[in-house]
Structure formats: structure tokens, C-alpha cells
């Protein structure tokens, strides 16, 4: 079922719609359309947050000629269902494939794919699995490796079998999201964010993050990896391991930001500007390559 895209509301907020998954789950979509766009981007958000937190980034893309769609992953934002819950271990991958192909069917050219944190993991795994084949992939602080202990990772695997949807606090340290105190304050007060995770979701993150690193040499398309070296929410060593393995593919461009926190696109200035400068440069080079 295709998402029906309404016109932009008169109050200036982004158009929204719903899209049904094969198992009956409905996902909430947000669009930042652009007449005459030269391209498009699908954004996949991270754990506990939602697509509405990407308005500022979507506006940045709009200014550069890209239409944007975001969606609230299952268990998140305005999408209904248990917070942080999954029915099956690969639900988030199946959802991304459905949303991506639905969006692509409405466009003259397939969209770029951008994933942040857990969304970066979902995006990377979906590309490596061949579920989606965007013209390019952008990964921001992807959750490829956790700060959790090996014992906790093993416990998540066990609990995913016996109590897969047991609600647990995700333990995210809000103060390590960004150096911008307003970003942190807005996150704390955001009624659509949540602080939950389930064993099945945790096991997916741990397991598939390791799989992404193991399979990185098979990276099939141009990819920009943006890494916050002072990330306190995901272990940047996972991105470094991914970059080392992906080097042989010839597809990966990696940019490290030594003092920045997890949410690179929401960092305090001048950090945010430096990140966006690198993103703009990479996008420009992809455009030139596509024209050759």
C-alpha cells in the first residue's frame, strides 16, 4: 500500500502520512517535499527518538535541492505499538525496505539513504543484505558496537528468547547527545521520545552491529561514515573497525570528529557546521560522479 502524500499544511509544518507494513503494523511518515528537487533522501532515526527531530537537517537538504522523507520506526514516535518492541528480530530491516521502495516508487530517481545511530545500523545492514540499493549511503554515529559488557550482550541474547519484549530502560545519557544544551533540554522535554528498549531489540543491535563489521568489505555502494570520536552513547571503535574492513571495497569515505558528541547534526557550533561542510562536500562529489 502506497503512502498517500498530502500537500504541505498551511501552518508550515511538514506533511504526514501512514504506511502499512506486511504484518499490519502502521508506520508514521513525515515529508519535507521540494518542487523540482534534484534528488531525495530517506532518513532513519535512532533509538528512543523520532523523525520529527530531523526538521533542521531536512531544511538543510531542502536548501540544497533534496526532498526528504523520514519515518518513525516501529516502537518509536507516533508509530503505535510497544515502545522499543519488535515482533521479529528483523522487523526494522523489513520496515526500512518497505518504506524505501514505497518512497522510491514516487520519485524519478531512487533516494539516498541516511541513518543515524540505531538507524545507521538499520540502514547499513539493509544495504549489506541487498534489501535496498540506494545510489549512496550516509551513516552518522552508527550503532555498530556498544559500550555494554560482553556479559550484558550475552544476557540480551538469552532474554530475547525467553522474554523478548520485557520493557527495560535503555540507559541513554542525555547529556552526551550534544554539547548544545538547548538540544539536550529539548530532547528531555520531547513528548515523543522514550527511554525504553526490549531484549529482542537489544539483541538485534548487538548482533547485527557485529554482522555489519564482519561484512563491511562487501560494501556495494558509495558511503559516507561520520564518526564522533567523543561519542558516549555508541562505541566509535565499531565505526573504526567497519572503516578498516570496508577500505578494500573502495566505496567508503570516513570523517572523524575528535571532540564531538553523538548527535553530529545537532552539535553546538562550530562543530555542526564542520560536519555539514563535510556532508556537502561529499554530496557534491557524488553528484559529479553521477554525471560522468
Residue ranges of each PLM-predicted region?
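Catalytic nucleophile-loop/oxyanion-hole region of alpha/beta-hydrolase
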Residues: 48-51, 77-107, 274-275
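Conserved alpha/beta-hydrolase
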Residues: 53, 58-82
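Short beta-strand/loop motif that positions the catalytic acidic residue
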Residues: 219, 225-227, 231
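An N-terminal hydrophobic leader/cap segment in hydrolases
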Residues: 1-21, 25-34
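Alpha/beta-hydrolase-fold enzymes
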Residues: 114-198
